[in-house]
Amino acid sequence: MKFIDCHNHSLPSIDDGAENMTMALDMLRIAQKDHISDVILTPHHLNGAFKNHANEVRTSVETLRTACIQNNIQVDLHVGSEVHLTHETVEQLVSGEALTYCDHGQAALIELPKHSIPLGLSLIHI
């Protein structure tokens, strides 16, 4: 049986996940050992500490893919982000500055504010 990790912070030095490439590769080796075939990399965006723009994330994913190939780590990596819900969220998703889930433009992984759920949340459709 294979598994998909749909929320992962293995991109090195980009948010509060992997501190460096060595740690990122170690995390993905463990994923491979645990029969995870696909990893959707979802660094934080707009959460007050991190603003990882889409093209920077795409570049980081490509760098990590290359490192995985060089280290014989056979896990398929997919681009994404964990977008903190702010007044900028919809605009950034529509413009492409924030990444959608798997970079397909169909859905987004949204991180809700820690202390409240915004009014009108159910009305958000892109």
What are the language-model segments listed below?
Residues 103-109, 122:
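HAD-like small-molecule phosphatases
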Residues 16-17, 112-115:
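Short, flexible loop segments at the rims of nucleotide/cofactor-binding pockets, characterized by
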Residues 1-74:
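An N-terminally biased module of ancient metal coordination in phosphate/nucleic-acid-related enzymes
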Residues 117-121:
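Active-site-adjacent beta->alpha loops and helix N-cap segments on the catalytic face
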Residues 2, 10, 47-48, 71-89, ...:
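Metal-cofactor-binding active-site regions of metalloenzymes
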